[in-house]
């Protein structure tokens, strides 16, 4: 987008899958089309910077965050443990060509991406993220819950089209008794904990 003229045609020929047309209507054709303007994925760069700072602040409080590419097209990575933080997974994610737990899956995903590129196309994917060590009681009900806050930020990334917490939409095929996360007392610490994590560690907008 260093050459604005490369994007001048977009005022007359909006691209499918981009915000060119709705932005044209909303801003009466006065928006910046160079590089996608303020709808560009380039603007996620400052989010990465803010995220890097936040990760350090959270780690200082014993809270760990880990994410990986869970799926590209029809190729899936090994799942993260949704209850226990595994340092081996983090090291694998940081080491592989793509941030995946399984090196073989990362290789196949890379081939899938390159194949789409060679056909002048693209391919979709899923990112899985886990937060470990978050204290119980963080968040608020209704419109200020943890899900609300996370979703609001996640949808700031232009390509994001869906967010799930815990079992997500798979709950539609489950009974309530299956989806519940029963409580138990840890024999060693005496603390209350859950046996499963179907709710994604959030109930009523508050961390469990």
Could you describe each region identified by the protein language model?
Residues 16, 20, 25-28, 178, ...:
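Residue-level signal for pocket-adjacent positions within structured domains
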Residues 15-22, 110-117, 171, 175-176:
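Short secondary-structure transition/capping segments
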């Amino acid at each position: 987008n260093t050459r604005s003229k490369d994007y001048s045609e977009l005022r007359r020929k909006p691209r499918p899958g981009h915000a060119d047309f709705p932005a044209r209507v909303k801003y009466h054709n006065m928006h910046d089309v160079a590089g996608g303007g303020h709808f560009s994925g380039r603007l996620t760069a400052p989010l990465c910077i803010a995220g890097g700072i936040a990760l350090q602040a959270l780690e200082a409080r014993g809270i760990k965050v880990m994410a990986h590419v869970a799926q590209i097209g029809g190729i899936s990575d090994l799942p993260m443990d949704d209850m226990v933080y595994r340092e081996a997974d983090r090291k694998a994610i940081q080491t592989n060509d793509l941030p995946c737990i399984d090196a073989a899956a990362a290789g196949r995903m890379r081939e899938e991406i390159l194949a789409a590129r060679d056909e002048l196309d693209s391919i979709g994917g899923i990112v899985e993220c886990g937060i470990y060590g978050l204290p119980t009681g963080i968040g608020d009900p209704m419109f200020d819950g943890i899900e609300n806050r996370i979703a609001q930020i996640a949808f700031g990334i232009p390509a994001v089209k869906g967010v799930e917490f815990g079992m997500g939409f798979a709950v539609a095929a489950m009974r309530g008794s299956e989806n519940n996360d029963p409580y138990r007392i840890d024999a060693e610490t005496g603390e209350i904990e859950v046996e499963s994590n179907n709710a994604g560690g959030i109930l009523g907008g508050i961390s469990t």
